[in-house]
Amino acid sequence: MVFSSYMLPALPYDYDALEPVISAEIMQLHHQKHHQGYINNLNEALKSLDVANATQDLARLIAINPALRFNGGSHINHSLFWEMLAPQGKGGGVPPRHELLKLIEKFWGSFDNFLKNFITSSAAVQGSGWGWLAFCPQKQELMVQTTANQDPLEATTGMIPLLGVDVWEHAYYLQYKNARMDYLKSFPSIINWDYIENRFVEMSKQ
């Protein structure tokens, strides 16, 4: 089986578009260096997987799995992350409406209560990881989840990621230093709730 190479997705905005919440320097490094690096490593792991499959090398197949999980998860998470953001004045920070808002209010009482829960849970991630607004299509339930390192939410929990925030230090340290909470408190003003609501509508039909 031959795998196609993955490529770095283009951002739907300029590197400086999310300022002052996320600096252009961070966005460029995060996208061009970190995300591209994960993709390069993923493609190398897939090449090795090809060889291992062709030779039926079970030990090599097992050894490749951590690299696939880490770098594949990184690519999934970051590809979603870029789409979940929007500049202020161009949709960023405009609260959700319609059915998603109703469901958020059902589970948290208010949109503000949800944001507090999301920020607090994401800030509490030990080391590196992600904070998520997750959706379970089978139960039509929302919940806040966190994942360690670059674990992809759906592959590890079965939940659908609607909103994610990267709490790896490379996502904020150049600008916020060790003040992760300051980064997270600023983050809601660049969330693209239109994209997330459309994703919710699509996923709720599954």
Curated annotation (Swiss-Prot):
| Uppermost EC category | oxidoreductase
Pfam families on file: Sod_Fe_C, Sod_Fe_N
- The protein's Enzyme Commission number: 1.15.1.1
Where along this sequence does the record place binding of Mn(2+)?
H30, H78, D166, H170
Cofactor binding description: Binds 1 Mn(2+) ion per subunit.
Matches recorded under InterPro entries? Fe/Mn_Superoxide_Dismutase, Mn/Fe_SOD, Mn/Fe_SOD_BS, Mn/Fe_SOD_C, Mn/Fe_SOD_N, Mn/Fe_SOD_N_sf, SOD_C_sf
Q: Where is the signal peptide?
A: none
State whether keyword Oxidoreductase applies: yes
Q: Which reaction does it catalyse?
A: 2 superoxide + 2 H(+) = H2O2 + O2
Supply the alphabetized keyword list: Manganese, Metal-binding, Oxidoreductase
Tell me which cofactor or cofactors this protein depends on: Mn(2+)
Its Gene Ontology molecular function terms? manganese ion binding; superoxide dismutase activity
The record's subunit annotation is: Homodimer.
Give the protein's function: Destroys superoxide anion radicals which are normally produced within the cells and which are toxic to biological systems.
Similarity remark = Belongs to the iron/manganese superoxide dismutase family.
State what protein this is by name. Answer: Superoxide dismutase [Mn]
Please name the source species: Chlamydia trachomatis serovar D (strain ATCC VR-885 / DSM 19411 / UW-3/Cx)
